[in-house]
């Protein structure tokens, strides 16, 4: 099973559409958005040929966002615990770094997916992979928008600059 991971798209429809096109080309089965979609209009592009899950980011205050996402996917509020292909996956935006660390260090999850920092991360702590796909570029960060694809069968993680 292939899992697409995206975060911090902040209403940039061009980036959202590029991410969706990439995920479809890679034939991912599920896409997880780690928060900061922001407005409902930019969520609708994720209504595509994959299952979709999203958590709330610190900029996701638009009250219609849940309704729009729920029309084609699942909106999990601040945290999601998913089981995909036998893998236990925690999804949290990452606003509180201490909570991210606790999720990783607990050893209860195969993957901890997060966003917020707009910086790509893939780290392994015991049996847990901590993954941040990055996000729209911010000052001092990489200049490219990235997404990630995880092969849940092999554990391989790849990043793609869009």
Q: PLM ranges: what are they?
A:
Residues 10-14, 38-41, 59-65, 96-101, ...:
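Active-site environment of divalent metal-dependent phosphoester hydrolases
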Residues 77-85, 107-108, 124, 129-162:
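Binuclear metal-dependent phosphoesterase catalytic core
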Residues 51-94:
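Helix-adjacent hinge/juxtasegments
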Residues 1-45:
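N-terminal active-site segment of His-dependent metallophosphoesterases
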């Amino acid at each position: 099973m292939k899992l697409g991971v995206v975060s911090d798209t902040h209403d940039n429809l061009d980036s959202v559409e590029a991410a969706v096109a990439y995920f479809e080309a890679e034939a991912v089965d599920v896409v997880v958005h780690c928060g900061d979609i922001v407005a409902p209009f930019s969520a609708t592009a994720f209504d595509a040929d994959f299952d979709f899950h999203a958590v709330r980011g610190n900029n996701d205050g638009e009250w219609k966002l849940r309704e729009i996402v729920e029309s084609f996917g699942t909106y999990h509020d601040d945290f999601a615990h998913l089981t995909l292909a036998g893998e236990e996956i925690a999804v949290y935006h990452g606003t509180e770094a201490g909570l991210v660390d606790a999720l990783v260090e607990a050893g209860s999850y195969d993957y901890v997916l997060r966003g917020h920092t707009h910086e790509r991360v893939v780290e392994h702590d015991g049996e847990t992979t901590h993954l941040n796909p990055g996000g729209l570029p911010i000052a001092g960060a990489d200049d490219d928008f990235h997404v990630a694809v995880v092969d849940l069968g092999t554990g391989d993680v790849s990043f793609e600059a869009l």
